[in-house]
Amino acid sequence: MKIFAIGMNYTEHNKSLHGTLSKPERPVIFTKADSALLNNGKPFFIPDHLGRIEYETEVVVRISKLGKTIPQRFAHRYYDAVTVGIDFTAREMQKKLREAGQPWELAKGFDGSAVIGEWVDIQKFRDIQALHFRLDLNDKTVQEGCTSDMLYKVDEIISYISQYFTLKTGDLLYTGCPTGCGPVNIDDHLVAYLEDRKVLDFHCK
């Protein structure tokens, strides 16, 4: 199983990073180790050696069939379910890595950093590019977005990634986060929603 993720893919989050909207020439792709996956409502144990850990709330797509060099017009045939996940990030470390021109994996791919919610059949939704989602932290909404605000759409991303990697059943795609990232602390309670459906519920330890 491979875990792909996209950076700077939402309009307002992109602006907050650059001061103005700066669409990358191509999608910004990074990966997480399979040991990053955290599911079934298991608690997230905050690492004590990575500094400030922040949540990034994202729509996640599940790949459902083998594919390579997939044309964009056929990309919708290669995923079957969607949910909300958290891309936990060691923010201070990521900043240092970016400044040094180094990859982000140490700040993004550590154990437990890819939290995943309950899968929902893609057929439940009319348009994957019109999904509203949000994160509640200790009963307060702290991050919300809509997939219509993506700079690169799901089918574009899948087509692009498949030019370099063979996609396999069960691979995951974290599609980027809206503005509103923030820190987590021990005993925090995180609940995420896809439209009005609760798909993720876990605690930090």
For each of these PLM feature ranges, what is it?
Residues M1-K168, L172, G180-K205:
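Catalytic-core "active-site belt" of small-molecule-metabolizing enzymes
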